[in-house]
Amino acid sequence: MVTHTKPIYRRIVLKMSGEALQGAEGFGIDTTILNRMVTEVKELVKIGIQIGIVMGGGNLFRGAELVKSGMNRIVGDHIGMLATIMNGLAMRSALNHAYVHSHLMSAIPLNGVCDHYNWMKAINLLSNNWVVIFAAGTGNPLFTTDSAACLRGIEIKADVVLKATKVDGVFSTDPIQHPDATLYEQLSYQDVLERELKVMDLTAFTLAREHNLPIRIFNINKLGALKRIIMGYKEGTLITK
């Protein structure tokens, strides 16, 4: 196993899905998971890692189901953006409670609640050891929060996008339905496309590939996994050119 005495990444984007935040519950925020993530983030901040967090919102609102029932897709996406802001507020509060400097930025204006997103300000905050939380996706409907994670990663010049999920990485097929599925340690962008592996939506993935932005998929429920990745341990699945 290759390890390093120093971190292999300096600036990261952590994509937190809403589903990861809800834990075993079917809805809402599991404060145990939230507080554990804050502890792990705080540990990384102490060693100088610059962290941007992109929030999902699926634990609070699943627009796809309502769209099937007749809701306008644009309206559904706007509600979803608000859900990510709610998660962002919870994350900011938890980080501040742990004495971690954090700043919440939204892609849509929400005066009095959080700042409007500004990439130059985000980079300045990161450089000064603040955790920056990005909410409201890209600010546009029809784009996922995975796309937002890749976009923000490119804008802030992140070394990698770390996608926190509830599985150990990218498998050859669904590991829940097929226990014998193969876990890939490393893939190229081309491998993912040719094998039609479910990593991110195509827009997000194409954006990362065009800008040579590495993606690592890992299990957020594995204690210490985030730091192991930062320190160069093999964890989850790494996707590069």
UniProtKB/Swiss-Prot annotation:
The keyword NAD does not apply. It catalyses: UMP + ATP = UDP + ADP. One of its GO terms (cellular component) is cytosol. Its main location: cytoplasm. Pfam families: AA_kinase (PF00696). UMP binds at G57, D77, T138, G139, N140, P141, L142, F143, T144, T145. Transmembrane segments: none annotated. Pathway: Pyrimidine metabolism; CTP biosynthesis via de novo pathway; UDP from UMP (UMPK route): step 1/1. CDD domains: AAK_UMPK-PyrH-Ec. ATP binds at K15, M16, S17, G18, G58, R62, T165, F171, D174. NCBIfam families: pyrH_bact. Catalyzes the reversible phosphorylation of UMP to UDP. Homohexamer. This is Uridylate kinase. The lineage of its organism: Bacteria, Pseudomonadati, Pseudomonadota, Gammaproteobacteria, Enterobacterales.
